[in-house]
Design a protein with these regions (language model features):
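Active-site loop/helix belt of alpha/beta enzymes
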Residues: 129, 145-187
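Glycine-rich, aromatic-flanked loop segments that form ligand/cofactor-binding clefts
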Residues: 134-148
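A charged N-terminal "starter" segment
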Residues: 1-131, 135-137, 160, 179, ...
Length: 187
């Protein structure tokens, strides 16, 4: 507006004045709505859209995103606490990432969050914690595909990596997890 940066129809200088100075963060709810709507329009209906809380864990943003997305992806107990404080249904939360600490697994299992297990060891730890808590852990397995992603700049497939279980080991691990009583959530 008038040659100045505008966010949500308001000039940056007006927002700075209202906030009482800088630095400040400004988010446009209308733009968040539009971006999610654009993404949904570009995808087949059967594809769900999850919000990665690590992208922006600000509680006001999380609360705004709640009706727009199908679920939430977290990578820490701190992010789980933000979603719990916002009243997000734990059935809509999945916890991914390597190196989950014991207390993080315990908090997630107690809350009823889906764990995306990165290894057989993490699955075993989750099952043991679930048994100790008297709760069936909700488990999915993160698959490390046996092919290399070409041209994407990503290096997450094609052999042993820190993210996920190698594809050839997934069937046995899935049978084991299901056989030990976990609530199977998928791949």
């Amino acid at each position: 507006l008038e040659g100045e940066l505008a966010i949500g129809g308001r000039t940056a200088s007006a927002l700075v004045e209202e906030a009482g100075g800088t630095p400040l963060f400004v988010y446009s709810r209308a733009l968040l709505d539009k971006r999610v709507a654009d993404l949904r329009a570009a995808l087949p209906e059967r594809i769900g859209v999850n919000y990665a809380v690590k992208a922006n864990p600000l509680p006001a943003v999380v609360v705004h995103m709640e009706p727009l997305v199908d679920g939430f992806d977290i990578a820490s107990a701190g992010e789980l606490a933000i979603l719990q404080d916002a009243g997000i249904d734990p059935a809509r939360i999945s916890f991914a990432g390597p190196g989950k600490r014991e207390e993080e697994l315990e908090a997630a299992i107690a809350a009823g969050v889906t764990l995306n297990c990165e290894s057989a060891g993490e699955a075993a730890r989750s099952l043991a914690i679930g048994e100790r808590l008297g709760q069936r852990p909700r488990i999915a397995i993160r698959v490390n595909p046996s092919f290399e992603l070409k041209g994407s700049g990503m290096k997450m497939g094609g052999g042993a990596k820190q993210f996920g279980v190698d594809a050839d080991k997934v069937p046995a691990l899935a049978r084991d997890v299901i056989g030990q009583g976990a609530e199977w959530r998928g791949l």
